[in-house]
Regions:
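Structural beta-strand/beta-sheet cores of well-ordered domains, especially the beta-sheet scaffolds
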Residues: 1-3, 7, 20-22, 39, ...
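Linear, non-domain "peripheral" regions
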Residues: 1-124, 128
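Glycine-rich, flexible loop/turn motifs
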Residues: 13, 48, 93, 98, ...
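Glycine-rich, small/acidic residue-mixed loop/short-helix segments
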Residues: 24-34, 39-41, 240-274, 281, ...
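Secondary-structure boundary elements
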Residues: 98-173, 181, 255-257, 279-287, ...
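Hydrophobic/aromatic-rich core segments of domains that either
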Residues: 177-271
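Actinobacteria-biased recognition of intrinsically disordered, low-complexity terminal regions
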Residues: 289-301
Length: 301
């Protein structure tokens, strides 16, 4: 599937601010299931945009605006081609999670992190769930996905920074909450799990249903990936109770939301502001990729 994506963020400040320094994470990655065809960032006021890959491998676009300004607009436009990822089909014994090399390579995705810290209640629920699952890491990851997918999708009941325990006790939230809770339960069970930020071409964030028209307004999305020994990362979308597919577009991966927040920055001035964010996605007819290729398979450990 080929998709055009337009990400827009607009800040309106109460009074003019200055010395604005910002980091944007909105660029689709190139990996084993998607290839970036085109990407461009513009800002108003205009600025010079520099780019680098952060510690987690996510592209970061940085820009600064020194002169006073009462409004900031950031537009990121991308074209990306995706394909359906391969799903693990063979059972993987859970004992393989304890292999020293695998454990050491994934240690950062086994530990608690700022938004993925949990108490005994979540831990107990995870182990009770695991007790009814066959000796198979893939089945275990699927069971955690299914359990989290049973939560209710509810907007406005949580905010960035809400704890995993609160999401679990409230029984609902949005995609970031689902991804954080799934990561917590997987890590508790010894399965490395990472948070993924991206876009989803869908008519409804709560169901993930496909789009009849070729263009739709969406929001940024989040899901989780579980590391399967000897296979790679298994991507699951508990918000929409589905495997990650060709309508999912990955931006970046990290321990939790903080590692892949779309836009963050600092400035000098009154912090009061209004914020508007919009994302539009358009499905295109497939065309030859030319010299753009999917990245080396990330199924390798």
């Amino acid at each position: 599937m080929r998709l055009d994506i337009r990400y827009l963020t607009r800040f309106r400040y109460a009074t003019a601010i200055s010395e604005s320094q910002n980091e944007l994470r909105a660029c689709p990655a190139t990996d084993h299931r998607q290839a970036l065809v085109h990407y461009h960032v513009t800002t108003e006021p205009a600025s010079r945009v520099a780019s680098y890959l952060d510690y987690w491998g996510t592209r970061v676009d940085t820009f600064g605006i020194r002169e006073p300004h009462a409004q900031l607009e950031v537009v990121a436009e991308a074209t990306v081609e995706t394909q359906v990822p391969v799903r693990p089909r063979t059972a993987v014994p859970t004992a393989s999670l304890q292999e020293a090399r695998f454990h050491d390579l994934h240690l950062e995705f086994l530990q608690p992190s700022p938004h993925v810290s949990w108490s005994s209640g979540v831990a107990r629920a995870a182990h009770e769930l695991a007790a009814g699952v066959d000796d198979d890491v893939v089945a275990l990851a699927q069971a955690v996905h299914d359990r989290v997918a049973d939560l209710e999708y509810r907007t406005g009941v949580t905010a960035v920074g809400v704890s995993v325990d609160e999401v679990f006790s409230e029984g609902g939230g949005v995609c970031q909450d689902f991804a954080h809770l799934a990561a917590a339960m997987l890590r508790e069970l010894g399965v490395p799990a990472r948070y993924v930020s991206g876009y989803l071409f869908t008519a409804d964030d709560a169901t993930g249903e496909d789009v009849i028209d070729d263009e739709v307004e969406v929001e940024t999305h989040a899901w989780v990936e579980a590391a399967i020994p000897g296979w790679g990362w298994f991507a699951l979308d508990p918000t929409n109770r589905q495997d990650v597919g060709e309508r999912h577009v990955t931006i970046g991966r990290g321990r939790d939301y903080d590692d892949v927040a779309p836009l963050r920055g600092v400035f000098v001035g009154d912090q009061r502001h209004e914020l508007d964010v919009s994302v539009s996605m358009r499905r295109l007819a497939l065309a030859p990729l030319g010299d753009v290729a999917f990245g080396r398979s990330m199924q390798q450990q």
